[in-house]
Amino acid sequence: YKVVLAEHQNYYPDISFVKAADESVRFAVDFKTTYRNPKKPHLCNGFTLGSHGEYFENRTSTKNIQFPYGSYSGHFCLGIIYDRADGATIDETKSHNIDELQAITSVAKNFQFFVTEKWMIASDKGGSGNTANIGSINNIADIVAGRGMFSKLGEHWFDEYWMNYKKITVQDGNGGTKKISTLREFVEYKNGDVSLI
């Protein structure tokens, strides 16, 4: 495989693995980092899993993506979950010589690594405020095991949900309308099996 780095900082994914003998075989790998919640160490802060905007909806689009989304055989996260170092006081403006490397205070510790397909650790909530990003689950054991909200439903449900996130309008039962914004509402709307959520 050849390693193709993202051409721009805001492109998805961070790295594309492209088969040398057949360049139509590609795998997307995005690097993700987050920290453990110090008061609830079984939880982490979560992270974004990429956009659910243009390139996610239009699988042939080349906007903000290295290769069209639909041309990848799989979309993976290589992640690091860590603890923030307690009480580390650091002067971020201070420079150090290379021979002082062992004396530099670390701001992170207790690293845990994971690799999983991104749809397997997705939640049904956006990941970053106003931007069109998919959010992750935040239970660390579930992240490492790939037990996100879509893991029993399958990748098709992940794709359908995020392509339609907050776009489908339904009656709210009180004479008004609302946008579908939870996986349960979406699965019910599509007559799916909500017990798989």
Regions found by a protein language model. Name each.
Residues 2-11, 21-27, 33-197:
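Nucleic-acid endonuclease domains
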Residues 13-15:
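Acidic helix-start/capping segments at beta-turn-to-alpha-helix junctions
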